[in-house]
């Protein structure tokens, strides 16, 4: 890593040693499948950087992923194919029609059995009724509802086939979407957005709808993005969290409910400084989760259904640690997903043996929040306001829920490819 930098002036740290480890000289060794970041601290210049490491295994081209739109799902397989199912009233399934699909169906994005196809999908995102796909050549493709320009083609015409988004002058490495806005993260750490912008969620100091990609202001070192309802939260390479757009439920963690047209940094629990050492962020409808490097999850924003997992239903304007039903902070968390008005976290096996003196949580999937149809896998329809275990550890690699709150459905997938 960073061959042009004096190695003696750098410190390296893997944010998930279950996927990759890093030696003092920067040598990376794969230890499992998945993606993580190597944190690099340059002592000479007192600055941080993070390098993404993705271990796909012998057969995989990319990391599998599931995302949910309004009554539909999009699945990215490890072989680079994109499959969709569910509601298709606007062509969001990318099937050249508007016919609903009752089971997963392969799109035309990539066919792993066609030896002539070399460019495959590496990321997917879903808005309310539109789908965004990132291909391995760094291009972005969209389909579905386009009433606010969220397809990025300069029009408001809906599409039933994937179309290429033009106007992003850098290679894209990740995409995100929610409701009527789309985002692209580039390899240089810049963020571009297009679509609905009434609350300033494009971060360009404007509230005007953008029908083609516009560059977000104030941020230039972003490594991960996650879009909520009319806002987006972003992870900086230095481990801090930025957000922009709609904040009327305090989901930015700024101890206020002001909307912002330019990105703002999340505060710490006490509100006295900036929240630091974060390795992943996830935006729900109007709440945000942030996972720290030491495996603790922070939640902030709307909490009417208990989705913050803090033991009550009061909204929080500063980030607060998530707890279990005994009131203990849940530790050793390896992944978090904020979905609609609920939250899902994955706890990895602890190196500490449980005993009468130690109540370290066992590995598995823990949930909290809105559960009117049992979408939290609890075998009942009772809302939760603390994290409760619902699934034994099976190395879950992706988790998602549809965006329709009244009839929400959730899905998880493990490293064996089972959904």
Predicted segments — roles?
Residues 76, 83-103, 143-161, 192-212, ...:
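Short glycine/serine- and acidic-residue-enriched loop/turn motifs that recur at repeat junctions
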Residues 64, 71, 80, 128-129, ...:
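Short coil/turn segments that connect the beta-strands within blades of beta-propeller domains
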Residues 67, 75, 125, 133, ...:
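Conserved beta-strand position repeated across blades of beta-propeller domains
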Residues 112-119, 175, 271-276, 327-331, ...:
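Short glycine-/Asp-/Thr-/Trp-enriched loop segments that recur within the blades
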């Amino acid at each position: 890593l960073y061959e042009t930098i004096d190695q003696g002036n750098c410190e390296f740290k893997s944010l998930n040693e279950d996927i990759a480890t890093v030696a003092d000289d920067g040598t990376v060794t794969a230890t499992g499948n998945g993606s993580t970041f190597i944190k690099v601290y340059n002592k000479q210049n007192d600055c941080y950087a993070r390098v993404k490491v993705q271990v796909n295994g012998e057969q995989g081209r990319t990391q599998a992923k599931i995302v949910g739109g309004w009554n539909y799902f999009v699945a990215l397989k490890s072989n680079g194919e994109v499959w969709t199912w569910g509601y298709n009233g606007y062509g969001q399934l990318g099937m050249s029609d508007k016919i609903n699909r009752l089971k997963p169906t392969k799109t035309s994005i990539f066919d792993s059995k066609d030896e002539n196809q070399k460019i495959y999908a590496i990321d997917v995102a879903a808005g309310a009724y539109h789908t965004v796909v990132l291909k391995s050549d760094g291009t972005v493709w969209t389909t579905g509802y386009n009433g606010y320009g969220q397809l990025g083609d300069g029009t408001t015409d809906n599409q039933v086939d994937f179309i290429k988004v033009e106007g992003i002058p850098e290679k894209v490495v990740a995409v995100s979407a929610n409701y009527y806005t789309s985002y692209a993260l580039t390899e240089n750490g810049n963020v571009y957005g297009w679509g609905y912008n009434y609350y300033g969620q494009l971060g360009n100091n404007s509230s005007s709808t953008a029908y083609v990609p516009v560059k977000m202001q104030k941020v230039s070192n972003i490594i991960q993005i996650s879009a909520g309802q009319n806002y987006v939260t972003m992870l900086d390479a230095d481990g801090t969290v930025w957000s922009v757009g709609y904040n009327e439920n305090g989901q930015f963690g700024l101890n206020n409910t002001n909307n912002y047209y330019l990105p703002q940094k999340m505060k710490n629990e006490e509100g006295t400084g900036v929240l630091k050492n974060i390795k992943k962020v996830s935006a729900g409808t109007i709440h945000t989760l942030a996972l720290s490097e030491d495996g603790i999850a922070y939640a902030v924003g709307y909490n009417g259904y208990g989705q913050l997992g803090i033991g009550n239903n009061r909204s929080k304007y500063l980030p607060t640690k998530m707890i279990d039903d005994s009131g203990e902070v849940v530790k050793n968390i390896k992944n978090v997903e904020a979905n609609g008005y609920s939250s899902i976290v994955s706890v990895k096996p602890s190196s500490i043996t449980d005993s009468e003196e130690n109540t370290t949580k066992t590995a598995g999937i823990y949930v909290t929040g809105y559960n009117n149809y049992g979408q939290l896998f609890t075998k009942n329809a009772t809302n939760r306001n603390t994290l409760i275990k619902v699934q034994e550890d099976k190395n879950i690699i992706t988790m998602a829920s549809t965006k329709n709150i009244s009839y929400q459905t959730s899905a998880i997938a493990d490293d064996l490819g089972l959904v």
